């Protein structure tokens, strides 16, 4: 059968990224407590395509991924990228994967356990060097400092999503990132809280009011002081309870205006 | 050209609903203040198909809709349904449309104006009789009564979405539904609030703590006492600030367990 | 601490459903090939609330779910529902759960294996009796019979999503539902296809053109003839390649116009 | 009342972007045929925040936007950005807005008219200079060249989304971008097609098979040859009818590997 993709292209235009997008695949990721966790990845797998070829070979992306037995670790990502470059005769390879990650947490006073879900992901590229970014989304509670200050009673508060991306010099567990982010908010949130826990979270959060600006800076302070973290991007989106839109703040290391 | 759709089907299975889904079309709806409002509808247009025919004629759904000059009112919906039944030789026709609707609201103390957006919709059917349901989604603020009661200071609160559906004996404006729902919550929410407004909303909501159960019942009380409303379904989903899931309550008129 | 939820409510309005929504939790479901499959559930857990009580106890829903060790089978669902009714002193309990489910499939000619992902779910209720519905979403290929008939060459085709719900007299595997649905379409689809497989799927689908009406009827024919299936609802949504909207057909057993 | 936001911050960390996100507002955009089109914008409005201030003033973003009477043109965007910088004492301002845009198109043979919807947007920044990017998403039809070549009959095809971003030296209408993109695909798609139109589109597309790689290159060829376009990014995502994931290609001007 003719290999249409391998035919010469005369338009003289290289393609930056080509491949498959939105592929769901079962994966196994590292878990600090249980060593391994089964979860579900949503993958984008891309390579570059030189100007001389008409198309890439889409089926090979799946073959490479499938060959790695579902293991998705930083080390494994580099191996997937190398295999993609070889299988597709490419110079650069890109793999991103998003996955839900579960942690068993105990309520702060009652100690009762339950699972909390975090949207995590990896962004990786291999050209000459291997680049790897860890993404973690942490839901937290933010109490508005302005509302607390100007009101005779109460203070508006809400769930906020903190999206962090980090490059690392050495391993930082997802669990550690979550702890740092929760520590930077008005209070952490939980799947299961009994009444005594709810009282505690309500009071702690009221005592620690935080704007989205505060949360982003507090996370950055913690990341700056961790020598394992070489780069970070921190975004905070607060689902304002008094509005139907979000408040947002973003700090990226090394980015000027 | 052969009309494959009109060919006889021998499988002896009537189809309950067939047509097109997810069609975006510019529309004009009634506006209490400005008479008319331009907005964007997302339509589902379905009819039944008797067991004897292989297929419906999809293009006619668009032709019927387009012929009505974008006007979407209760009266107009019935006319669209009648035209669909005729154009497609059907017994029953169904049209649902969802659209964002904007209202200019003034902040409670400063009086400054801004637009608020509400997801609205119509669900309509014509068999022998014409059935019409108005849908309105109203974002509100809910302060947790339990959290307030058990805590020495503060109370967790959050944005909650109140989804109501009503059948009417006579016209009820979208604006009236929104006012009834906002009145049933801890406080209304706004796109633009200056500091004095934020203080007001914070204190008012703290003085009116409401569970999702309370909000649903308070809305129902208002609907029960409005003779124009003959049927209702009220759903409240609160984006709990202390959890990463929603609290939910639903009351439907005439529904037992 | 005061139990605000248990206080008497004087509004005299029972609530049909109250509980938690959108809770993500790790689960284990039955797998025809491997006995068990780890996946991720998104849960809604509701009970009724009599007119005399102000609120339900939201934390107990999570406690009940957590106590079942993540197992989600039809039998286990009934046990969760019973526990919810007891823990929350309710008459009726409702649990819905949606989850991705993976099946290893071999390409039709090359035989190469890969995982395919299917969105599945359970809808269950316990009042006096236990009611259980299995949901499966199957992506398939549909070639338009009209386009093929009237065109001198080619025929437009596209991915279509077939959403089925079934009530069962005895166990039907998710895998069996998928096979019946794929058999009813122009062709099944795969995550990984080599060139010889792509040729096969292209030709097979061209030889079996199917409207959404055809697919829905063909699925129903297979379900009618399976004594294990006591009720079904079949929806087909075709992501029309020549339009930016969907074609849709729906057949529900026992539903008249 | 105390202005908490204006207080001095001692953490010494400037914030790259702070403001509001996901704000829906009614807007009026330019329309080549009808001069003006009412539509609905979803806005992100951000500024930078120097290290010395604790917070920005969120309400002023809405005030600035509201003051511009809903007009959203390139010229107007610069004015919004300037007003944001002044109102918030910022150095840089960012505004992005996404909106649906409708065009009346006539079917290729029958000539019957209907509206097609396109997701469009603007990305604008003002620091010392004003930067403006136009985004347009164009759904098209792609027939797979490989499938056509290797199969004895038929060829798999599908809806593909072409997302383009352009910077301009002088005005390029959204309508012109759409025409260039449709011309680069196997065939354009329409909301309403009668049988003779469907035959035409089926045959034209079969005669013009295009990979995602082909479509991206063909769009780039057209953009390279238009002196009004100074920069482009072209992404093509094809909703593969034989898979449950997308095929993807991306070319960005000036980007190396």
From Swiss-Prot, chains A, B, C, D:
Pathway field of the UniProt record reads: Cofactor biosynthesis; 7,8-dihydroneopterin triphosphate biosynthesis; 7,8-dihydroneopterin triphosphate from GTP: step 1/1
Keywords in alphabetical order: Hydrolase
Q: Which reaction does it catalyse?
A: GTP + H2O = 7,8-dihydroneopterin 3'-triphosphate + formate + H(+)
Q: Name one Pfam family in it.
A: GCHY-1
Question: Which N-terminal stretch is annotated as signal sequence?
Answer: none
Nucleotide-binding in keyword set = no
Protein function: Converts GTP to 7,8-dihydroneopterin triphosphate.
Q: By what name is this protein known?
A: GTP cyclohydrolase FolE2
């Amino acid at each position: 059968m003719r290999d249409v993709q391998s035919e010469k292209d005369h338009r003289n235009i290289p393609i930056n990224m080509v491949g498959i997008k939105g592929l769901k695949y079962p994966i196994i990721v590292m878990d600090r407590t249980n060593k391994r966790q089964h979860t579900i990845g949503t993958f984008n797998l891309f390579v570059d395509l030189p100007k001389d070829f008409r198309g890439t070979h889409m089926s090979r992306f799946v073959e490479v991924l499938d060959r790695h037995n579902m293991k998705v670790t930083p080390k494994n990502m580099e191996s997937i990228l190398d295999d993609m470059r070889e299988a597709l005769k490419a110079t650069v390879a890109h793999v991103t994967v998003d996955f839900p990650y579960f942690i068993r947490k105990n309520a702060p006073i009652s100690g009762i356990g339950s699972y909390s879900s975090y949207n995590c992901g990896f962004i990786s590229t291999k050209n000459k060097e291997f680049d790897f970014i860890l993404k973690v989304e942490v839901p937290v509670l933010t109490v508005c400092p302005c509302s607390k200050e100007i009101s005779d009673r109460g203070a508006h508060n809400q769930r906020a999503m903190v999206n962090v991306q980090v490059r690392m010099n050495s391993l930082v567990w997802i669990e550690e990132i979550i702890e740092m982010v929760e520590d930077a908010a008005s209070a952490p949130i939980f799947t299961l809280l009994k009444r005594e826990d709810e009282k505690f979270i309500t009071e702690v959060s009221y005592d620690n009011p935080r704007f989205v600006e505060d949360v982003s800076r507090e996370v950055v302070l913690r990341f700056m002081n961790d020598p394992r973290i070489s780069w970070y991007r921190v975004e905070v989106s607060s689902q304002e309870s008094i509005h139907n839109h979000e408040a947002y703040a973003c700090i990226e290391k090394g980015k000027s205006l």
